[in-house]
Amino acid sequence: MCIRDSGIRNCVGLARRPKTDELWCSTNERDALGDNLVPDYITHIEDGGFYGWPWWYMGGHQDPRHQGKHPELEHKVITPDVVLNPHNASLEMTFYDGSQFPAEYRGDIFASEHGSWNRSVRVGYEVIRVPLHQTGHASGEYEDFMTGFVVDNGHVWGRPVGITVASDGSLLVTDDGSNSIWRISYVGK
């Protein structure tokens, strides 16, 4: 056994990109630095890579609670592929390898965003899509795919947790807020 990568605070979702050995991770970053720090992220995992925890984050940004510690690591911190809202609580992720959705979805990442618990304005509570543009590389962008788990008064009625591609090509999403499993099917435009 050996350490493959380090400095990843909380890699909750871990998935291998189909037909490759490339690992991707959805990470819940650190808390207690306010509403807007530190962003959660989704990224491919570089063999031997260092992702900053606990001293650094998002490249060369030092956690103020560790000011002046380990300056030699600053330039080793890998910047993630896709930066999410802080406290989104990105949990499980999957690569879409089904055939039910349009062709442009194949190979893309779908991730469940469980939602914030420690932020003044709620974020997350959705399923997102990270387009890989048939190249296997993320552009840094993501889009909302399944939303509506927070109603106008701020009440949360659903929290996506697990996600997988079903044998028919639909997506299955577990939800520990409504105690449900959702099936997302494509029925055409």
Model regions and ranges:
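Loop/turn residues immediately N-terminal
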Residues: 30, 178-179
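Beta-propeller domain segments
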Residues: 9-10, 14-146, 152-158, 166, ...
